Amino acid sequence: MRLRGRGPRAAPSSSSGAGDARRLAPPGRNPFVHELRLSALQKAQVAFMTLTLFPIRLLFAAFMMLLAWPFALVASLGPPDKEPEQPLALWRKVVDFLLKAIMRTMWFAGGFHRVAVKGRQALPTEAAILTLAPHSSYFDAIPVTMTMSSIVMKAESRDIPIWGTLIRYIRPVFVSRSDQDSRRKTVEEIKRRAQSNGKWPQIMIFPEGTCTNRTCLITFKPGAFIPGVPVQPVVLRYPNKLDTITWTWQGPGALKILWLTLCQFQNQVEIEFLPVYCPSEEEKRNPALYASNVRRVMAKALGVSVTDYTFEDCQLALAEGQLRLPADTCLLEFARLVRGLGLKPENLEKDLDKYSESARMKRGEKIRLPEFAAYLEVPVSDALEDMFSLFDESGGGEIDLREYVVALSVVCRPSQTLATIQLAFKMYGSPEDGSIDEADLSCILKTALGISELTVTDLFQAIDQEERGRITFDDFCGFAEMYPDFAEDYLYPDQTHSDSCAQTPPAPTPNGFCIDFSPEHSDFGRKNSCKKVD
């Protein structure tokens, strides 16, 4: 399985004239991975700063947060859902000014000596919602503290000592993960505030919903666009020579990012307020279109591509299982195309056995694009051709249907490695005893990992203790139970990456979530929100 190069296809623009003129090809880099490499000189600088300026900066930043706490406490007293008085009382204006000054001093102490601001922030009556992108770090809180705008936060955040008080001051929209109706209530609250004619503070939302490495803009969630009111796009840049800012799912952990950032002589950040985007009538009726068109405007300002990767792809990339997906896996692209065809992985899981039986009956017989379309019960389209090309390694216009089923199984249940392998054995196994040879195992694992080349000889020989030249699922399962880290020992050291990211190393241990300012969130990975193994 490989990601064959295909140029960007033309996509129809919306009738409003604001749609994407072209759907750009997927980025070469996985947007959920960040690799940080320090030169010898940079390592020496970090060592020097760790012993000198780092502890001073850390203590001073903590002191400034403590200094801000009593002001925020007094100003946040009272019912949180009560409409702010208009105009603001003089004492609240003073508190607001003091808190902004304290927060700016805190960032200055952390090395953010100059925060470049371009454009003009719109008034609340002009744009009640500010959409910020790309979302790449907890340092994205800088524009929040500079404007004291409201944000969307998890309800649990208000119980954090000191930080919770500071959060309550900006009157955030709290999302409760224990309330099944939370998403609807959140959107309704955003809509209520957005339509208050400037009575509430502006709401800052990161529509990507998770952190990326800023190489592209992933799919925007529609929560900020459902109210159908004008929004002001805001783009963030960190033009530093060494990127110690980015905090993604795979890469340096939160504490390491903080340490390395505070060990830089100075850190730069640029905040650009773009012109207010007023939705057309069509966009008001279609929040997804509205979100897509705003993303296009922001991507153009940033000079980056857009991709249809989503927050759910992040879950796929970081799913815990015995087969860890490499950073350059093609399965993210496969998952994107599955959704592009209108197929939902969560609904397809129950049909995997039916798909696998149909593929097994083919016994490796190759099929062409029209047959593939009939198998999926979808018309031939650009998205289907792109998906077909993922499995057409030779470029001969034919694919093995079994590979599609294996890839689909990984996307539908990314954490259930053995279930996918068992399904593959049923399709590839001999009719007599269900055994497979080394070539079959290589094909199964390459597809399950979404890569084009993989050496499985050592793994196959380790499983095939009797040297029969064939193994069964029971053999594989028994070996996996005895050596749960078999992939680390037998696959990844010799893994050759696909053409799409030839120089990308194996992905390190995943991080947890960045602070999510988007109204739509997931429970995935919360148990690992602070876990990091270096």
Curated annotation (Swiss-Prot):
Residues that, per the record, bind Ca(2+): 392, 394, 398, 403
Lineage: Eukaryota, Metazoa, Chordata, Craniata, Vertebrata
Protein name (record): Lysophosphatidylcholine acyltransferase 1
Organism this protein belongs to: Rattus norvegicus
Residue ranges annotated as Cytoplasmic topological domain: 1-57
Domain EF-hand stretches: 379-414, 451-486
Record's comment describing the protein's domains: The HXXXXD motif is essential for acyltransferase activity and may constitute the binding site for the phosphate moiety of the glycerol-3-phosphocholine.
Alphabetized PROSITE patterns for the sequence: EF_HAND_1, EF_HAND_2
Pfam families: Acyltransferase, EF-hand_8
Database matches in PANTHER family: LYSOPHOSPHATIDYLCHOLINE ACYLTRANSFERASE 1, PHOSPHOLIPID ACYLTRANSFERASE
